[in-house]
């Protein structure tokens, strides 16, 4: 399994998954794989299938139960049973999910690189900026 980080509090919880599995391996991590197989046929891109499945596996890992993710016309995700607010992000083989039972949440994950470095000052306080790149994975 590729759960890289997980953090839980009363007000929210989040996790980061590094996708290293095949679609078949990801399906095997879910309690009811058949539930997802038909939806997978809607994706033509193998990469997109992996992202989509990784989000569902991460959500299951965080909550310990399956939840259905639906999307508003704007593309914003929400859980069908409204038990949690949810935000989803993905970048180059990683997915992140944050959940809160009490308030709207947001998460964004980006692979560190020149593109992020050039715009980080627009979205982050000085104390949040990474002052020095320290390896492949910087948290």
Predicted regions and their residues:
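Core catalytic alpha/beta fold that binds nucleotide/phospho-ligands
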Residues: 1-139
């Amino acid at each position: 399994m590729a759960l890289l980080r997980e953090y839980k509090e009363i007000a929210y919880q989040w996790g980061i998954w590094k996708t290293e599995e095949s679609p078949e391996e990801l399906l095997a991590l879910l309690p009811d794989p058949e539930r997802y197989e038909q939806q997978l046929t809607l994706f033509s891109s193998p990469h997109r299938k992996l992202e989509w499945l990784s989000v569902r596996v991460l959500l299951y890992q965080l909550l310990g139960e399956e939840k259905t993710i639906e999307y508003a016309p704007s593309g914003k995700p929400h859980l069908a049973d409204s038990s949690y607010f949810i935000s989803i992000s993905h970048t180059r083989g990683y997915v992140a999910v944050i959940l809160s039972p009490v308030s709207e949440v947001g998460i964004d994950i980006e692979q560190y690189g020149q593109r992020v470095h050039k715009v980080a000052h627009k979205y982050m306080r000085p104390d949040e900026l990474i002052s020095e790149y320290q390896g492949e994975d910087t948290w």
